Every structure is written in structure tokens, then in C-alpha cells.
Amino acid sequence: IAWRRWLHQHPEISFEEFETTAFILERLKAFGGFEISRPAKTGVVAALDTKKPGRTIALRADIDALPIREDNALPYKSMRDGVMHACGHDGHTAILLGTACTLSKISEDLAGRILLIFQHAEEQPPGGAIELYKAGVMEGVDEIYGLHLSSAYPSGVFGIRPGVLTAAT
């Protein structure tokens, strides 16, 4: 929760996620076990290679915020006037960081390669995904999974289905 709240207080718009990137890097380095790369000026890709045969699975979270003013009295509201995490990317990033922490602890029990993609600039066309693709991030990936927070479900419940869900591109 502390990670999510810090991220919520420090939102950054697409292609300007410098503090967010530094925050992610600091935690990934502390967890250990990841090969970390920066294929673009913001965003992070962390690879966990178990050295055992298996598939390459990618997990992706978006890290950018929106140019919207947050108008509430939450103790962790945005500290940047006119910019906020209105779409849940602070939660997505915190969830992927939590996943990274857990994976680093159980890596000996895993097989294959796991790629954690902290994608910059999801909200602003042409989007950071294109830069990552052109940099070769998706080469060798067998499957990729993402998530999106939704107020349509009560806390503790998640929705899942085969195929594409909530994808705009």
C-alpha cells in the first residue's frame, strides 16, 4: 500500500516518468536477481532467468499518469497539480513491484524466463509500447499478461476471461 500511495502522490505524464522509473529501479535492485534494462528514456524491463528450460512469460504494468487535477482531500493525493493517477496505473505498478519481490524470493522454484515490463507512456499516442517493441523487448516472449484495476468488482474479487480484455490497442 505504501508503494501505491507514494506513486499516487508523485504522478508523471507520459514520456516524463523519471521519478517513477527511479522508484521502480531502486526496488528492483533491492529485491535482487533481476537483469534490469532501460530500452527507453523512461520505464524499466526486468528479466528473471531461472536458467531452467521453460517458456518466457511477460507481465506488464503501465506507469504513467493523466493530465487531470485531483480534487479530493485524501492524505496521499497527488502532489502535482494537474496530474494524477486517475486510471489506476499507480496500483498496476505497485502490484507488479509486489510480484517482482515475490518472484525474487521463489526464483529457485521456477522454470523459464519471466520478463517484468514497467511500460512508460501508455496514455499518450503513439505510446511507449511501440518503443519497447522496436527495442526488441518482445522477442522470445511466449505469453504476456497485464491487468487493469476496475471499480466494477468489489475489493478482493477479480475478473478474468480467455482472450483480450480491456485492450484498446
Residue ranges and their predicted role:
Residues 45, 66-68, 73-84, 91, ...:
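Histidine/acidic-residue-rich, glycine-tolerant segments that coordinate divalent metal ions
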